[in-house]
């Protein structure tokens, strides 16, 4: 359920967003978003893992069974499954889960499964996962849901599990509708449950529709190779003691 919603034209996004981000995500995955355009793929669905997380895959940081929480179209789950990991992706959007399942079936990845679930209250995976990855979910949930979310993923984590979070920096996106974080805010929330190894500056990538224009000047947006754009964020690495 990751998002690049605040990249969108400032006026349009506030006029057309519903009161619930969950509904906006669902319409985006169905190709029915007013903000992005009819039939347009969500900008955050770039067809591959976020580059910051792809680098961790290459470095061998992902171990054992992997939980992709807020998986969206599940690019990282699918990439890890192709490397032999058993992956489970959870997302609140039924449309996103259906897209992920379809792609897994297309690639013949029986070791990648997906379920509709609320990240702040899911159960049924106690002590299972060696690695948990949050690819831009953290800023997409209400602040009041963070405690339930962190409790849920700790419950699902195996002893010594690793946890990776890619999240927007509040300095790059100072206003809603999402809940970007400062480094201190991220550290304070996560350190209640995990031993933090590192929080470092990162970039979050998106691909905008052809002809898209008018992004807010205040955002730290960079043009990247292959038609992508990026904005500032944080990459957190942590583990269970």
UniProtKB/Swiss-Prot annotation:
Subcellular location: Cytoplasm
Pfam family, one: Methyltransf_25
GO molecular function ontology, one term from the record: methyltransferase activity
One of the record's GO cellular component terms: cytosol
SUPFAM superfamilies noted in UniProt: S-adenosyl-L-methionine-dependent methyltransferases
InterPro entries, A to Z: Methyltransf_25, SAM-dependent_MTases_sf
Alphabetical GO biological process terms: cellular response to iron ion starvation; methylation; response to hypoxia; response to salicylic acid
Primary enzyme class: transferase
Keyword annotations of the record: Cytoplasm, Methyltransferase, S-adenosyl-L-methionine, Transferase
Function: Involved in cellular response to chemical stress and may contribute to resistance toward antimicrobial natural compounds as well as drugs. Catalyzes the methylation and detoxification of the P.aeruginosa toxin 2-heptyl-1-hydroxy-4(1H)-quinolinone (HQNO) to 2-heptyl-1-methoxy-4(1H)-quinolinone (HMOQ). Can also methylate 3-bromo-2-heptyl-1-hydroxy-4(1H)-quinolinone, and shows much lower activity with 1-hydroxyquinolin-4(1H)-one, quercetin, 4-hydroxyquinolin-2(1H)-one (DHQ) and 4-hydroxyisoquinolin-1(2H)-one.
Extra information: Is dispensable under in vitro conditions in both axenic and macrophage culture.
Family statement: Belongs to the methyltransferase superfamily.
Entry protein name: 2-heptyl-1-hydroxyquinolin-4(1H)-one methyltransferase
Lineage, uppermost ranks: Bacteria, Bacillati, Actinomycetota, Actinomycetes, Mycobacteriales
Gene: htm
């Amino acid at each position: 359920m990751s998002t690049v919603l605040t990249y969108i034209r400032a006026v349009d996004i506030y006029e057309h967003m519903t009161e619930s981000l969950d509904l906006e995500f669902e319409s985006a995955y169905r190709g029915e978003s007013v903000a992005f355009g009819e039939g347009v793929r969500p900008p955050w669905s770039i067809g591959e893992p976020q580059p910051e997380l792809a680098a961790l895959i290459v470095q061998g940081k992902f171990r054992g069974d992997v939980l992709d929480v807020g998986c969206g179209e599940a690019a990282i789950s699918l990439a890890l499954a192709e490397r032999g990991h058993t992956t489970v992706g959870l997302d609140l959007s039924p449309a996103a889960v259906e897209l992920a399942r379809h792609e897994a079936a297309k690639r013949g990845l029986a070791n990648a499964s997906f379920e509709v679930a609320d990240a702040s209250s899911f159960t049924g995976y106690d002590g299972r996962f060696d690695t948990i990855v949050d690819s831009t979910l953290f800023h997409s949930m209400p602040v009041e849901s963070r405690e339930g979310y962190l409790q849920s993923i700790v419950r699902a984590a195996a002893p010594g599990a690793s946890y990776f979070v890619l999240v927007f920096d509040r300095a790059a996106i100072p206003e809603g509708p999402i809940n970007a974080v400062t480094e201190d805010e991220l550290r304070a929330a996560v350190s209640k449950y995990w031993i933090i190894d590192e929080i470092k500056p990162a970039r979050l990538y998106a691909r905008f529709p052809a002809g898209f224009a008018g992004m807010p000047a205040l955002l730290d947006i960079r043009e990247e190779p292959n038609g992508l754009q990026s904005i500032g964020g944080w990459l957190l690495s942590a583990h269970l003691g």
